Swiss-Prot record:
It is found in: Secreted. It comes from the Eukaryota. InterPro entries: Transthyretin-like, Transthyretin-like_sf. It comes from Caenorhabditis elegans. Gene3D superfamilies: 2.60.40.3330. One of its GO terms (cellular component) is extracellular region. Belongs to the nematode transthyretin-like family. Keywords: Secreted, Signal. This is Transthyretin-like protein 15. Residues 1-19 form the signal peptide. PANTHER family: TRANSTHYRETIN-LIKE FAMILY PROTEIN-RELATED (PTHR21700), TRANSTHYRETIN-LIKE PROTEIN 15 (PTHR21700:SF120).
Length: 130
């Protein structure tokens, strides 16, 4: 039992030593029906064994512009994604739509410029939250 505990501690320590800090910046402008809108923008990092990590969050400005930078320490490459919570084309009062956007792995370590994020185009990952 002690050997198993010792081995687990050593492996965990090695994982922390091998983990490297990885950073991503994401910027863009939120658009609904050809108009710039404010929206809540959150940068996440997908984890397999534990809950996903929130890297950064902000409200886009009145012009819909946002820029987020986040970092995480991982042994393998991080898997960042963006969640935008908004009310573009939502029919029910008090409800919001949650749109998810994957960030290309080759953008890790740099800036991913999404330019215009057209929220009125539904994707398979969109969900309504009431």
């Amino acid at each position: 039992m002690r050997a198993l505990l010792f081995t687990s501690v050593v492996l965990l320590a090695l994982a922390f030593v091998e983990a490297k800090k990885q950073t991503i910046t994401v910027k863009g402008t939120t658009i609904c029906n050809k108009k710039r809108i404010q929206a809540e923008v959150t940068l996440w990092e997908k984890d397999t064994l534990d809950p996903d990590d929130k890297l950064a969050s902000m409200q886009s400005n009145k012009e819909g512009e946002f820029s987020l930078t986040g970092s995480d320490d991982e042994i393998t490459s991080i898997s960042p994604y963006l969640i935008i919570t908004h009310n573009c084309n939502v029919k029910k009062a008090g409800c919001k739509r949650v749109s998810e956007y994957l960030i290309p792995k080759e953008k890790i370590g740099g800036t991913y410029d999404m330019t215009y994020v057209t929220l009125d185009i539904l994707s398979a990952k969109d969900k309504e939250k009431c």
